[in-house]
Amino acid sequence: MKTLSVFLVLVCLLGLVQSWEWPWNRQPTRYPIPSPNPRDKWCRLNLGPAWGGRC
């Protein structure tokens, strides 16, 4: 019984770690912290060419 509960806790922890890794892996593509071009940011916000959102 003890080994089963430990196994379940480990599985839950692994699931949490994997679910927490996903946003971190996706974040650089969505919001680049060192943005090379500020126009890129406005373009992603879909503000249009008037706001420098030229793609």
From Swiss-Prot:
Which GO CC annotations does the UniProt entry carry?
Answer: extracellular region
Q: Which Cys-Cys disulfides exist here?
A: C43-C55
Which residues are reported to carry the modification Hydroxyproline? P28, P32, P34, P38
Kindly list the places in or outside the cell where this protein is found, as annotated in its UniProt entry. Answer: Secreted
What's an example GO BP annotation here?
A: regulation of female receptivity, post-mating
What is the documented function of this protein? Represses female sexual receptivity and stimulates oviposition.
What name has this protein been given in UniProt? Accessory gland-specific peptide 70A
Q: Which organism is it from?
A: Drosophila sechellia (Fruit fly)
The taxonomy runs: Eukaryota, Metazoa, Ecdysozoa, Arthropoda, Hexapoda
